[in-house]
Amino acid sequence: MGSEMEPLLRAWSYFRRRKFQLCADLCTQMLEKSPYDQEPAPDLPVSQAAWILKARALTEMVYIDEIDVDQEGIAEMILDENAIAQVPRPGTSLKLPGTNQTGGPTQAVRPITQAGRPITGFLRPSTQSGRPGTMEQAIRTPRTAYTARPITSSSGRFVRLGTASMLTSPDGPFINLSRLNLTKYSQKPKLAKALFEYILHHENDVKMALDLASLSTEYSQYKDWWWKVQIGKCYYRLGMYREAEKQFKSALKQQEMVDTFLYLAKVYIILDQPVTALNLFKQGLDKFPGEVTLLCGIARIYEEMNNSSSAAEYYKEVLKQDNTHVEAIACIGSNHFYSDQPEVALRFYRRLLQMGVYNCQLFNNLGLCCFYAQQYDMTLTSFERALSLAENEEEAADVWYNLGHIAVGIGDTNLAHQCFRLALVHNNHHAEAYNNLAVLEMRKGHVEQARALLQTASSLAPHMYEPHFNFATVSDKIGDLQRSYVAAQKSEVAFPEHVDTQHLIKQLKQHFAML
């Protein structure tokens, strides 16, 4: 079949079937017949088509969807020169954790991240970290659940300049960018678009891509919305958010597209204007009713603003439009679990299992839901599956930690002790396991060991209130009132509504007043 097809048609077929390497190799063979493959021959349309197709194939091999995947690196967080209001009005900022005024589960029930927001049901880039207050916190914050190392710069996920291009052919790069006459290419719209994407995504030369986009926009007399979106993307990568905002707004006036709404919302989110982003998404929904990506964007913002009830409503709207949306199902399931409805959560996680999601996290959640819904026959088998599917040490540590909770629930403290120790063997930065192990040691009467474990837990996770409160309680019992008071204050900072902490502080103040 292959020998009967024309080479260009076969290359196009490979491209459509996402066999990009085969497509690029075939285009290379076709271009080798002409003396130079640096630029397409003007009188040979086949050569020109092969050149464009090869550029597109090489771009697709390293292409990243920039709408969803967005990670702020340490460099972007700490060295950010954009001035943002330090004391924003409540409910208008993503940088400060909002208070839970929506009737959702409190911090005592639902664990929170370092940024002060509840842990989401679906791991997304940047949901783990938020914006750290200090460099030390930034370095300590894991980039995702899979690695403890923070991303140092957002450019780290883009291919290094020249690296990918050198790999594509042994003779050197496919296109020698320094020799390109951008003005000539900007006058050929079809060529210019393929070349722009190659320069931006494959070569990661944002400045040259911006130059080409500016010349092409000028040539189109500022009437082509596509080029305005691309200029906005370049400005966003360069950290020029206000300029990016202008370009995206101008593109939306000419042609309303879902992607443009999403790019503009990203700009508002990084400028810490979630309310503006919400209004923009709602404008988008007026133009594109029921669009899943816009509904999901609204739900994510509400979730980050600690408004779990509104987030759940929008995730339900997402499921009405697309009933196989994994993120929406996982987030609604998580919300039901922490709202003391494990049976309902179990239905959502089983739905994920039916859809073909088969990983450690899902079986871990199924095991917990089965236990709290009193379906004990399925609990341990789910955790066994989770352990067998764990891809790294952190995942195994989380499974052992949850098994420790099951052991506490059935009253087997020895098993719980072993499970928490195994969690620490797999991940010795697991603050929750240190805290729970300290409680078990305290019950055995090992006070000093419990205090040491609690100090470790509070230093690893200063945003958690439990280690601080437990340390304050232990110190109070052995008469170390000063340390007890300091720890209780830290607990109050972490969780101001915690009644037991307030009682302890009041009691300690009475002690100090009597001295």
From Swiss-Prot:
Protein name: Tetratricopeptide repeat protein 8
Source taxon at top rank: Eukaryota
One GO BP: protein localization to plasma membrane
Tissue: Isoform 1 is retina-specific whereas isoform 2 is ubiquitously expressed.
SMART domains: TPR
Gene source species: Mus musculus (Mouse)
Compartmental location: Cytoplasm, Cytoskeleton, Microtubule organizing center, Centrosome, Centriole; Cell projection, Cilium membrane; Cytoplasm; Cytoplasm, Cytoskeleton, Microtubule organizing center, Centrosome, Centriolar satellite
One of the record's GO cellular component terms: centriolar satellite
TPR repeat intervals: 4-37, 225-258, 259-291, 292-325, 326-359, 360-393, 397-430, 432-464
Primary gene name: Ttc8
InterPro entries: BBS8, TPR-like_helical_dom_sf, TPR_rpt
Subunit structure: Part of BBSome complex, that contains BBS1, BBS2, BBS4, BBS5, BBS7, BBS8/TTC8, BBS9 and BBIP10. Interacts with PCM1. Interacts with CCDC28B. Interacts with PKD1.
Keyword set, alphabetical order: Cell membrane, Cell projection, Cilium, Cilium biogenesis/degradation, Cytoplasm, Cytoskeleton, Membrane, Protein transport, Repeat, TPR repeat, Transport
Gene Ontology molecular function: RNA polymerase II-specific DNA-binding transcription factor binding
Function of the protein: The BBSome complex is thought to function as a coat complex required for sorting of specific membrane proteins to the primary cilia. The BBSome complex is required for ciliogenesis but is dispensable for centriolar satellite function. This ciliogenic function is mediated in part by the Rab8 GDP/GTP exchange factor, which localizes to the basal body and contacts the BBSome. Rab8(GTP) enters the primary cilium and promotes extension of the ciliary membrane.
Sequence segments annotated as region (Disordered): 89-109, 118-137
